Regions:
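Helix-turn-helix
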Residues: 21, 25, 29-63, 67
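Short, well-structured alpha-helical segments
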Residues: 95, 141, 158-166
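Short secondary-structure transition hinges
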Residues: 102-153, 159-160
Length: 223
């Protein structure tokens, strides 16, 4: 590799590091001050940049949120869609989803709680992510309905149950903080807590745990 090529690689790496720092600092500001309360000059200052330099990496504040929403919603939506098509107990599949989503949020380098406030997904600029969020919610509701059909879950309103699941996950992150990789057992704790309230037979929890964890491992390995 020539000196010129090495220089280009170094600049590229620094650019990626700066972009990542902007995303991290933006997410923290959105969680603290909200989307509308955060100005691009605030983001630039937090990231150690001059405001014009920020726009070299992101053309707008919306572009930053787009990337954070993509991180927040894309993997969980895809994973939940796969679970809907899997066979086996719906309770175990729901357990696998809750564990996956909790781990996804807890291991995030970003504080994702702020981008799910301020009614952002109701804004026309974020319609793509509103649709993605709706699809994810529908997948969760389908799992719940499948649990009604196979008798593994109590016959609760699927919409209410889905909102409770989503709300518990987000509020858990607000409580424990993001970058919670050190919170060992958190995904299992949250999944256990939720399933205890949804199972038609609470005594089936150990079997649901075993099946759900095996399914989670298999699907994550295949990602």
């Amino acid at each position: 590799m020539t000196l010129v090529q090495k220089s280009k690689v170094t600049r590229g790496q620094k650019g990626e590091q700066t972009r990542e720092r902007i995303l991290v600092k933006s997410s923290e500001l959105f969680a603290e001050k909200g989307f509308f309360g955060t100005a691009t000059r605030d983001i630039a200052a937090a990231a150690g940049l001059q405001q014009p330099s920020l726009f070299f990496h992101f053309v707008s504040k919306q572009a930053i949120v787009d990337e954070l929403l993509a991180y927040s919603l894309s993997r969980p939506k895809t994973f939940a869609g796969r679970l809907v098509k899997e066979s086996g107990s719906a309770a175990a599949r729901l357990y696998a989803y809750i564990s996956f989503d909790t781990e996804h949020l807890a291991s995030s380098p970003y504080d994702l709680t702020g981008i799910h406030q301020d009614g952002l997904l109701s804004m026309p600029d974020f319609r793509e992510w509103k649709l993605a969020g709706n699809t994810l919610a529908q997948h969760i509701r389908t799992l719940i309905r499948q649990g009604h059909a196979d008798g593994s879950l109590l016959p609760l309103d699927p919409i209410l149950a889905q909102h409770m699941i989503s709300g518990i996950n987000l509020n858990t992150m607000r409580r424990v903080g993001y970058k919670a990789r050190g919170k060992r057992g958190l995904p299992e704790f949250v999944a256990d807590f939720i399933l205890r309230g949804l199972l038609s037979n609470p005594r089936s929890l150990p079997a649901v745990q075993k099946e759900g964890r095996a399914l989670l491992l298999r699907l994550k390995t295949a990602e």
